[in-house]
A protein has these predicted regions:
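Transmembrane-helix motifs of polytopic, lipid-linked glycan transferases
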Residues: 2-5, 77-101, 140, 283-290
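Short hydrophobic/aromatic helix or loop-helix immediately within or flanking a transmembrane segment
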Residues: 28-35, 47-70, 249-265
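Juxtamembrane segments of multi-pass membrane glycosylation machinery
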Residues: 41, 59-81, 86, 98-99, ...
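Membrane-interface alpha helices of multi-pass inner-membrane proteins
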Residues: 153-179
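Membrane-lumen/periplasm interface segments of specific transmembrane helices
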Residues: 189, 203-280
Length: 291
C-alpha cells in the first residue's frame, strides 16, 4: 500500500512540476551532474552558487541522467522524487515507535500536512533544488536519532550525515547542527544535575554535531584546494529595524508556502479553498512547536 501511494504521489508531483518552466538554476544543476557523471567529479572549473548541492541533489541528478540521459526532464523527475521522499519520511518520523491505529494516525497526520504543495510554491518546492533535498537528508538524521538504540554508532552516523549535508547546503548549520548540539547538550546537563553523572549518549550527540560543523566547513575548502569547484558566497550585512516588518512578512509568507497555506498567493477559488484547508496543518505544526 505504501509503495503504491508513493508511486501515485510521485506521478502527481511530477505532473505539477511540469506546469512550470525549468529555470537556469535547474539547468545548471543538470549540467553539473552531467559533468560529474563524465569524470569531472570535483567539478573543476565550475563556479557554483552559495549552495552547491554537491552531496545531495547532484548525485541524485547523476543517477537519473545515467538512466535517461541529459535533458530538462531531469529536474522534474528529481523534484518529484525528492518531495515524495519528504512526505514519506515526515510520516515515518511522526509515527515513531507507535503501532496500530495510533501509528497510522500519526503517519497520516504528518504526511497530510505536507502532502499537497501549493501551486504558487511549485517553483520553490517542485523545481530546481531549493533546500528541499536538504530537508529530506535531515529527516534521515532525525530518524537515526529517534529510532536507533543508544550506542557508539549513532553519534558517528549523525556526524557523518550532518557533515555530508553541510557540504551541499550550509543552512543545515541552523536547521540541524546547532539545534542538535544545543538540545543534546541541554539534556546532558540536565542528566548531570539530576544524577551527578553525564549522559554520554547525549554528550556524544552534541559533540558529533559540533564536529560535523567543522568537517562541513573544511570539506569544501579541501575540494577547492584540490582543484574542484568554488562557490559564490551570499553578501550579507546588518539592516536597520525599519526593514524588519518587510522581512517578517516575507518569512511569514514563506512559512505558509511550505504548508501550502498561503492564502495571499492563491490565484483561483480552488487554490484558495485548498490553502484555507491547509491552514489547519500550519496551525497544528505551530501548536506542536510551542509544546
Amino acid at each position: 500500500v505504501v509503495v503504491l501511494a508513493a508511486a501515485v504521489l510521485f506521478v502527481c508531483y511530477w505532473r505539477q512540476s511540469l506546469t512550470q518552466p525549468i529555470s537556469s538554476d535547474g539547468a545548471a544543476n543538470a549540467l553539473q551532474a552531467w559533468d560529474m557523471l563524465h569524470g569531472n567529479l570535483l567539478l573543476h572549473g565550475w563556479l557554483l552558487s552559495d549552495v552547491s548541492f554537491y552531496t545531495t541533489e547532484l548525485p541524485q541528478y547523476m543517477l537519473i541522467e545515467a538512466i535517461r540521459g541529459l535533458g530538462p526532464g531531469v529536474v522534474n523527475l528529481a523534484a518529484a522524487m525528492t518531495y515524495t521522499l519528504l512526505v514519506l519520511l515526515a510520516g515515518l518520523l511522526a509515527k515513531g515507535d507507535a503501532g496500530g491505529r495510533e501509528g497510522r494516525a500519526r503517519f497520516l497526520l504528518a504526511a497530510g500536512i505536507v502532502l499537497a504543495p501549493q501551486l504558487s510554491a511549485t517553483s520553490t518546492l517542485l523545481q530546481a533544488p531549493d533546500h528541499t533535498g536538504t530537508a529530506v537528508a535531515l529527516l534521515v538524521v532525525w530518524l537515526v536519532i529517534d529510532r536507533a538504540r543508544p550506542r557508539w554508532l549513532v553519534p558517528v552516523a549523525v556526524c557523518v550525515l550532518l557533515a555530508w549535508i553541510m557540504v551541499a547546503d550550509s543552512i543545515v548549520l541552523l536547521t540541524g547542527i546547532v539545534p542538535i548540539a544545543v538540545a543534546a547538550g541541554a539534556r546532558a546537563a540536565r542528566a548531570l544535575a539530576k544524577r551527578a553523572e553525564p549522559d554520554w549518549h547525549e554528550l556524544s550527540l552534541a559533540a558529533a554535531a559540533i564536529l560535523a560543523g567543522v568537517f562541513g566547513v573544511m570539506a569544501p575548502l579541501i575540494i577547492r584546494a584540490a582543484g574542484g569547484y568554488t562557490t559564490a558566497p551570499v553578501p550579507g550585512h546588518i539592516v536597520g529595524l525599519d526593514r524588519l516588518p518587510g522581512a517578517a512578512r516575507v518569512t511569514f509568507h514563506a512559512a505558509l508556502n511550505i504548508f501550502g497555506a498561503n492564502v495571499v498567493a492563491a490565484h483561483s477559488a480552488l487554490e484558495l479553498a485548498f490553502a484555507v484547508l491547509h491552514l489547519a496543518g500550519a496551525a497544528l505544526a505551530a501548536w506542536a512547536a510551542c509544546l
